[in-house]
Design a protein with these regions (language model features):
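N-terminal nicking endonuclease/strand-transfer module with a His-rich metal-binding environment
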Residues: 1-189
Length: 189
């Protein structure tokens, strides 16, 4: 049975997304001790999938490939920077630059599998043409409670002496481009 959830999608920061999603050693070292929101003992529960048709798993490389593809298909450079224009009423309107790679954070349950999120990605591709490039299930993030959890809280659990409230979620990195036209996908088409 399908379960309702939500996803929040923003332009992907291709230079830093991979470090957070893969939990690289450098990323883990750079997290301030006071801001630890990852339980290292739970990191082994995380899962990942890289689209085999993606080529290089490096997002920066993929971004550069998209820039070249846009130039070849449209004859124009990809509009990367935000710009301003005047509207009909004379007001200044900010127009966002192209976001060819976007990342969504999808709320999941503790028992959600990688196969479940892959099925979601396949449905996004079928409906809107946005291609999932990478999927990361994070089951090691959350926050520490100051005391005991509330009576109805069934997700929090004890780690040593402290209580931890998990934030189960998945990161889905999408290629938002139509590779036949060189233009970005419009979800309302």
């Amino acid at each position: 049975m399908a379960t309702k959830s939500s996803i929040h999608i923003k332009p992907c920061r291709v230079t830093s997304s991979g470090a957070h999603n893969r939990r690289t050693a450098e990323y883990m070292r750079n997290i301030g001790k006071s801001q630890i929101y990852i339980v290292h003992e739970l990191t082994s529960n995380n899962e990942q999938w890289i689209n085999p048709g993606f080529g290089s798993p490096n997002l920066q490389t993929h971004y550069e490939n998209i820039k070249r593809m846009v130039k070849e298909k449209t004859g124009r450079a990809m509009q990367e920077k935000e710009r301003e224009r005047k509207g009909k009423n004379g007001k200044i309107i900010k127009v966002a630059g192209c976001s060819p790679i976007r990342e969504g954070v999808l709320l999941i349950r503790p028992d959600t599998t990688l196969a479940d999120v892959r099925k979601f990605g396949e449905e996004c591709q079928r409906r809107w043409g946005i291609t999932p490039l990478q999927i990361f299930l994070h089951k090691d993030e959350g926050h520490w409670l100051s005391g005991q959890p509330e009576a109805g809280d069934r997700e929090s659990f004890q780690v040593g002496e402290k209580w931890f409230k998990p934030n189960y979620h998945a990161h889905v990195v999408f290629d938002w481009m139509n590779h036949e036209t060189g233009k970005s996908r419009k979800l309302n088409d």
